[in-house]
Amino acid sequence: MFPKTLTDSKYKAFVDGEIKEISLQDYIGKYVVLAFYPLDFTFVCPTEINRFSDLKGAFLRRNAVVLLISCDSVYTHKAWASIPREQNGVLGTAWPMVWDAKRELCNQFGLYDEENGHPMRSTVILAKDLSVRHISSNYHAIGRSVDEIIRLIDAITFNDENGDICPAEWRSENKDN
């Protein structure tokens, strides 16, 4: 299930109020969370995106970045990012919102839901060399735990640095989220 190599490309993304092109290669040397979500302007997705934004500092302290990915256009991302949180928007989102226009990213991991026509609510964590270290998917109506993703980054980092295993419920001694 884990691809040995990733096909990389340039992707349009809404980043810091602008439309830019990004590539996974831009993030070599960092842990990368690929947070696939079904659609903009939905109800579960903004709760996740806003939580990722709220915990940006925790990710940065771990040398990690988050890419928020759907097949909605970068222009739809931009429109959604102008709507306040109280109205189910993601105003002030802290991470790039990536347009997987050709479904290249989600198809590499088998995360495109053909029946419903959008990516599954899924998380992929890449190591600093962009190797795949974690893949998980949630039922579309169930949001993911951003705190658990941070725990997984801690575990992956611990394994990378020490070569040691991390049993169930393992937690880093570093308690800062």
Curated annotation (Swiss-Prot):
SUPFAM superfamilies to which the protein is assigned, alphabetical: Thioredoxin-like
The protein's Enzyme Commission number: 1.11.1.24
Active-site residues annotated for this sequence: C45
GO molecular function, one term: thioredoxin peroxidase activity
Annotated GO CC locations: cytosol
CDD domains from the UniProt entry: PRX_Typ2cys
Other facts noted in the record for this chain: The active site is a conserved redox-active cysteine residue, the peroxidatic cysteine (C(P)), which makes the nucleophilic attack on the peroxide substrate. The peroxide oxidizes the C(P)-SH to cysteine sulfenic acid (C(P)-SOH), which then reacts with another cysteine residue, the resolving cysteine (C(R)), to form a disulfide bridge. The disulfide is subsequently reduced by an appropriate electron donor to complete the catalytic cycle. In this typical 2-Cys peroxiredoxin, C(R) is provided by the other dimeric subunit to form an intersubunit disulfide.
Function recorded in the entry: Thiol-specific peroxidase that catalyzes the reduction of hydrogen peroxide and organic hydroperoxides to water and alcohols, respectively. Plays a role in cell protection against oxidative stress by detoxifying peroxides and as sensor of hydrogen peroxide-mediated signaling events.
Name recorded for this polypeptide: Putative thioredoxin peroxidase
Organism: Encephalitozoon cuniculi (strain GB-M1) (Microsporidian parasite)
